[in-house]
Each structure stands twice: as C-alpha cells, then as structure tokens.
Amino acid sequence: MGKVTGFLELDREVESYRDVDIRINDYDEIFSGEHNLSQLQEQGSRCMDCGVPFCQSLDGCPIDNLIPEWNDLVYNNEWRNALERLEKTNNFPEFTGRVCPAPCEGSCVLGLTDPAVTIKNIELAIVDKGFDEGWIKARKVTERSGKKVAVVGSGPAGLAAADELNQMGHSVKVYERSDRIGGLLMYGIPNMKLGKDVVDRRINLLREEGIEFITDTNIGQDIKTTELQAQFDAIVFTTGATKARDLPAENRDAKGIYPAMDYLTANIKSLLDNGNVDQDEFSATGRDVIVIGGGDTGTDCIGTAIRQGPKSLVNFELMSQPPVGRSEDNPWPQWPTIFRVDYGHEEATSVFGLSLIHISEPTRRYAISYAVFCL
C-alpha cells in the first residue's frame, strides 16, 4: 500500500449528509452532493496491507470488489485507474455506493481494533467523479453473436444481466411489467436515498449500448412464455422480491394499514408523475403514524412519512435491542449485529424526539389510524 502507516495516523472521517432541518423539506438525495476528494484520499490511505482482505471475502463484499486496489489508487490520486478497477466487478457502483449496507466495512481488518476504512464513501466518490469527468460513457458493442436473449424484470439483477449479456455481443431485450424501468431501484428505494435521475442516467447508457427496454408488459399475461421461447435463444428471469412480509394480527385488513412496498411505491410514483410534488394516496400528512420494523426499509418509511408531515410518528421494532458493539457470539468478520440509527431515525428524532420502542412479543391487534409495516 502507498502509505503503510495511514491506519495508525488517521482517524475515520465519514462524509456527512445534508442538514436534517433542510433535507426533510424535500425529496432530494440526503447526500451533500460534493465529495471532499483530499479527505477521501487520506481515508484511502487507512486501508492496510492486511494480507488477506476480508473486505472482499464471503463475509464482505458479495460481488468481490477489488477494494484494497482502488483504495490505494485513490490515495495516490489515480481516480481514473480506480474507476477501471471498480468497474471490473461492479456494473453499477453509483447504486451500491448509495444504498449498499457496506458489509465490506463490517469485515474490514482494521475494524478489529479501530473504526473501519470508509469504503462505501470512497466507492461512491470514484463513480461520481467518473461521471463528472466524462469517463463513463456508452460502450458500443462492435460484434454481435447473432443470439437473442430476453430478460424478464428490470431491477438491479435484470439490468446487470442485460449489461453483461449485451457486452458479450448478444442482442438483449428487457421486459418490465411496470411503467418505468428500474424495478426496486425505481419504485422501492426512496428518492432521497437514490435519486431517480441517477437510475435514469444508467438506463440511458444501457439503451445507448444497444439494450432494448419494454415496459407495461407482464410476462405470462401480455406475452406467453411460449412466445418468448419461440422468439429468443435464452430467457433470464430476474423478477425481484416485491411480495411483502405480512404481519397477521387482529384488524390487519383495516383501512390505513399498508405494507412498506405499497407505501413507498405509491410515494415514489406520485413524485415522478407529478413533477416531484407528492400527491400520494397513502400520504401520512396530518396522521398519527406507526412504522413497524426498524431496519433499512423501516427507516425509508420513516423518512418518507416525515416529509409528508405526520401529526405524530412512532417506530416499533420487533426484535430486542442489539448491543452497541459486537457481542461474543457475533465475532469479526461477520456482519456486526449492533444498534444503528439511520437517516430516517435521525430525521424523526429531530422532528418528534422519536424513541425507538422495542417489543419482544408479536403485535396482536391493530388499533391505530395509520400504520406501515416494514418487516
């Protein structure tokens, strides 16, 4: 590594979000928008010459990102080379750099004794700089194999499959049942966490590279699978996980109780259809809101509700409160099961002084005017 003593000399410094009091008034991304490149170079120097980089092991990055390599390249101000290494393993680092929970940081060797390297921040800065500098462009395919492939579903898996198959020279057509391409990238992750302009930017690149996209088409209904088999040499099913985890209890079917997928999708679609003006039919405006579930989806629901202006908001967590640090039965390099406060909780605390209420027994009965369950 370029600076072998970096992890001894420098503390972890994480890039900050926009101020809470400002960001709760809009649906823009919570990120500040500008990267402190010199600070990120220093943070890259904290990456150790650890021998076995657990950050890209089974407990770390699931796509085997070459993390130590691009950390060191960033430290040496070789951003374009860092982008080249990042794109070796990651089709869409602008997505993962925003929404990935960063298991790589949980298994960082430095994390045994000190706060981990800011891998996620560095990844996002690399790809954002790549777009800003014009380094990321459509990669035209010069030779075609003559084979045709249908991809069913346009979420992250479908887009990645389409990208890989297209670069191999196959002609790819992606079918999406919704009115917009992107799957859960478009309709599952709130705008403030993943701006839809970021999603559209990548889709436009893929389209320019020769991938064809078909929306409003439900395979099995609008087109039979036998028809696809007749038209294509191969079919890839990447249909996603849009079915909600239910929480059966008395009054479950009462009006005003919604699964997170329905709630988040309605909000995002309303914003996209109405020029970023929320006309969500499930709006929490003026209501007493309970969000059941305190994980990533829960905090997305909290953040969405806060922007809609609820009368009150309470968050229930079904699990008992985890420890602040690792427990003995949760050793490194496993993902650290610890108490976390994310952007939505921070916003709710600012507005309502939110106290996360932990319960160990299942919810028995709904007796409220408005609830979103995010298990």
Question: PLM features: what roles do these ranges have?
Answer:
Residues 357-375:
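Single conserved hydrophobic/aromatic residue that forms the stacking wall/gate
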Residues 21-23, 180-187, 253:
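Gly-rich Lys/Arg/Thr-decorated short loops/hinges at beta-loop-alpha junctions or inter-strand turns
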